[in-house]
């Protein structure tokens, strides 16, 4: 955001400060000035002169000798400029003066000093200047000739400062405006801050433009089909338009802000945009079919040619301005070539609207077009500002004689923004700032920026253009800004301290990290987007939900074009990279999100789930990985109820070495050996093992409320159980029987032997468990142990298990 000091003084006429004073004070009150440029920094001793007489140079065909009246005397200047004639008034740099650079437009640091000298034997006591030599350009001064000396208008006063006459005795400030201060994206907002900073009167323009006795609604009809994307649309009509140059003062204001003057109509819309921070657009009403404006979403693949002559392709997320037949503009971004203003325009339709900032930002990015207007709309403008801006534009049209304003306005208002109200709490404000200000002093500071006090409700009322005022802390900041941050006394911090505590989900994540790192795993991180080709690499079935990846609209490339639905690709890629680097024993883990759409194309936000993923190869096997998972479940209070189901059906895992981890009937994760074909596809030449635990599912069952039992007072009784077990029976099934049938007196059990050999019949294996029985309140009797063992044996028999003799 740039503004010139002269433009600010139009609204703060009593402002009298140097550029450095302005910079320091404004920065201290929160409107940070990044830097400034004095337009006349390298200009000196330049006055308006009038050419009284021109003679040919006796020794040079391309040079002429001019006698120039500079007010106090006449000086002789030799020049080669082809465009001067007797009577012209020109900028003259006198002997010892300085210009900013050469006629090629390149500036010289510190300027170029001009001295009296001779050209082909003829004395020259100065130099007449082109606009480029004065440090500016023809874009900023369109009346300047393409080649040659700048010619002043006839009413220029001979002898006066040419720098002042050209408006170069000015300073342009560059600001760093934060996104919450939308009001400061206009010169009026900056001027309001300057007036408050220097305690001067703020004099905004008095906007009043009723127009003639006609009605704008008789000229145009406005329909807004999507009120959420267009909270307000204002339209006014100006007829009998006369296109011509804008006045010099307006051109100078625009030039200082880096905007090239074009004509009175275009300059007025740009001027109001810079003044109010409200983008505007003008349409030739005669090109608007049906005299109707329709604000609607574009159609998918709709083509549209913008003012810059580029054809652009729209989708249904882009908001368009249309007439009765066609699109005439992209809302909030740029108008169309088919409705552009020409010198033959007779009737103009002015538009001042408020569009949804998020939609404008995404649309601008989607079609690859960003403009000054879209940059302002992105911040979220005040709908109440649109009417004042369009009235100001019409007022300027009347004042400059550029047309006849039609009475009334077509105003489609879908949102009336109410002023924000914040409770006034002087004690809280003093506590936050460490000050001892009275309520009256606070209210005086707040009044500087138009924050008023409602006595009846004891509230601070913020105008609608101050979208950043919502809480007491915001009010305290306003007080601090104008009291002076440098005046706030040094105090020790005070307040109520509370014990910090991690959210439950973060505690689970911390446990996952601790367990993984304790077991020798190193943390890795992979991209959240990947190539759709990995679905085939993982051997996913055609109807697998993991193939339903969300396509990214602006991917880094094909390899990063969909959001990941599984973390396996990233883990296996990392294992493969380590294997290719000949790292022999690798253990990695990752805590990362996967993105599962409810349906495609997206109609709502996808299901975003965090997965705890483990991967390893080298010195480890399936049971090592299972042990890490059990350790995790132990720490989160779930181990005793986690079952392992080998029928998980994962096509990317070895069919005989995989299992779902199930808690209370719900799958919380899976583990297994990577399928050899998948490992080969990734270039992993060793057996690899992975485990994936869904953290969000774990959150449903996890608990850190651990229960502790006292030290046993009574003796334990041990029984060994040796069995012949069918190979189809899983250890988990046996342990389930032991837990359910052993009752409360079964304290623990331990598998201590597995045997397969000639002494065991085919299809069976021998397994031996050690069972520990104990009662916490008394010494166990043999009958109690016998009864428990009988229940256990009956349960094992149901599984086809026989006791060994």
Task: State the predicted function of each range.
Residues 448-451, 598-602, 607-608, 613, ...:
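A carboxyl-terminal module marker
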Residues 40-44, 211-212, 497-498, 502, ...:
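Beta-rich nucleic-acid/ligand-interaction surfaces
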Residues 198-224, 401-429, 436:
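Terminal amphipathic helices with adjacent charged low-complexity linkers/tails
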Residues 5, 24, 64, 198, ...:
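Glycine/proline-enriched, intrinsically flexible loops and inter-domain linkers
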Residues 1-214, 349, 368, 372, ...:
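Phosphate-backbone binding interfaces of nucleic-acid-interacting proteins
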Residues 422-584, 719, 772-776, 780-805:
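Extended, well-folded interaction surfaces typified by the phenylalanyl-tRNA synthetase beta subunit core
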Residues 120-135, 144-149, 163, 171, ...:
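Mobile "lid/hinge" segments at catalytic clefts and subdomain interfaces of large enzymes
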Residues 48-78, 158, 263, 269-338:
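Conserved mixed alpha/beta core segments that line enzyme active sites in large multi-domain catalysts
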């Amino acid at each position: 955001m740039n503004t010139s000091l002269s433009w600010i003084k139009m609204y703060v006429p009593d402002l009298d400060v140097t550029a450095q004073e302005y910079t320091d004070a404004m920065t201290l009150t929160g409107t940070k000035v990044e830097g400034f440029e004095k337009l006349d920094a390298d200009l000196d001793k330049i006055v308006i002169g009038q050419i009284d007489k021109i003679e040919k140079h006796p020794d040079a065909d391309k040079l002429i000798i001019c006698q120039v009246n500079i007010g106090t005397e006449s000086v002789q200047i030799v020049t080669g400029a082809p465009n001067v004639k007797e009577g012209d008034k020109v900028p003259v740099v006198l002997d010892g003066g300085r210009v900013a650079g050469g006629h090629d437009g390149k500036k010289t640091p510190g300027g170029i000093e001009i001295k009296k000298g001779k050209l082909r034997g003829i004395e020259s006591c100065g130099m007449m200047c082109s606009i480029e030599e004065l440090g500016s350009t023809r874009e900023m001064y369109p009346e300047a000739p393409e080649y040659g000396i700048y010619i002043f208008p006839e009413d220029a006063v001979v002898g006066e400062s040419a720098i002042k006459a050209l408006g170069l005795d000015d300073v342009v400030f560059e600001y760093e405006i934060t996104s919450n201060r939308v009001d400061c994206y206009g010169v009026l907002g900056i001027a309001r801050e300057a007036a408050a900073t220097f305690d001067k009167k703020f004099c905004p323009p008095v906007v009043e433009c009723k127009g003639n006795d006609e009605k704008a609604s008789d000229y145009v009809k406005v329909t807004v089909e999507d009120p959420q994307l267009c909270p307000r649309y204002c339209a006014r009509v100006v007829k009998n338009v006369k296109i011509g140059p804008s006045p010099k003062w307006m051109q100078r204001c625009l030039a200082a802000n880096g905007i090239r003057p074009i004509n009175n109509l275009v300059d007025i819309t740009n001027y109001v945009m810079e003044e109010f921070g409200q983008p505007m657009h003008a349409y030739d009403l005669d090109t608007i079919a049906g005299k109707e404006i329709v604000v609607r979403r574009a159609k998918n693949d709709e083509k549209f040619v913008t003012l810059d002559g580029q054809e652009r392709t729209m989708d249904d997320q882009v908001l368009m301005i249309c007439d009765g037949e066609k699109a005439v503009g992209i809302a909030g971004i740029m108008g169309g070539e088919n409705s552009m203003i020409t010198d033959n325009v007779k009737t103009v339709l002015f538009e001042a609207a408020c569009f949804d900032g998020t939609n404008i930002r995404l649309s601008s990015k989607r079609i690859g077009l960003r403009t000054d207007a879209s940059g302002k709309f992105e911040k979220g403008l005040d709908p109440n500002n649109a009417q004042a801006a369009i009235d100001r534009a019409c007022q300027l049209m009347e004042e400059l004689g550029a047309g006849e304003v039609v009475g009334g306005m077509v105003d489609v208002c879908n949102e009336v923004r109410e002023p924000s109200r914040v409770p006034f709490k002087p004690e809280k404000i003093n506590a936050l700032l460490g000050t001892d200000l009275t309520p009256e002093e606070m209210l005086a500071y707040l009044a500087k920026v138009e924050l008023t006090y409602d006595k009846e409700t004891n509230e601070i009322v913020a105008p609608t253009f101050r979208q950043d005022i919502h809480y007491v802390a915001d009010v305290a900041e306003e007080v601090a800004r104008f009291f002076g941050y440098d005046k706030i006394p040094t105090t020790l911090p005070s307040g109520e301290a509370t014990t910090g505590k991690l959210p439950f989900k973060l505690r689970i994540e911390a446990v996952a990290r601790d367990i993984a790192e304790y077991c020798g795993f190193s943390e890795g991180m992979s991209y959240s987007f990947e190539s759709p080709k990995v679905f085939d690499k993982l051997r996913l079935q055609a109807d697998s939900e993991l193939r339903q990846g969300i396509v990214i609209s602006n991917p880094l490339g094909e390899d990063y074009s969909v959001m990941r639905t599984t973390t396996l690709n990233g883990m296996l890629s990392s294992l493969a990279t380590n294997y290719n680097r000949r790292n022999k024993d690798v253990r990695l883990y990752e805590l990362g999100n996967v993105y599962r759409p409810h349906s495609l194309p997206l109609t709502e936000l996808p299901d975003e789930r965090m997965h705890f993923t483990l991967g390893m190869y080298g010195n480890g096997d399936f049971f090592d990985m299972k042990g890490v998972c059990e350790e995790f479940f132990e720490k989160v209070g779930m181990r005793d109820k986690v079952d392992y189901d080998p029928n998980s059906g994962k096509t990317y895992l070895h069919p005989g070495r995989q299992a779902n981890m199930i808690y209370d009937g719900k799958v919380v994760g899976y583990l297994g050996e990577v399928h050899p074909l998948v490992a080969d596809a990734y270039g992993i030449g060793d057996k690899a093992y992975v485990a994936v635990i869904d953290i969000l599912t774990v959150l449903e069952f996890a608990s850190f409320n651990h229960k502790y039992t006292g030290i046993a007072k009574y003796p334990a009784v041990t029984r060994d159980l040796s069995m012949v077990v069918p190979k189809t029976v899983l250890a988990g099934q046996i342990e389930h029987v032991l837990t359910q049938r052993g009752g409360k007196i079964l304290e623990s059990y331990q598998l201590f032997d597995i045997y397969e050999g000639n002494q065991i019949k085919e299809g069976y294996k021998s397994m031996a468990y050690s069972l520990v029985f104990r009662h916490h309140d008394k010494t166990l009797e043999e009958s109690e142990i016998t009864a428990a063992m009988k229940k256990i044996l009956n349960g094992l028999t149901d599984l086809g298990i026989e006791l060994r003799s």
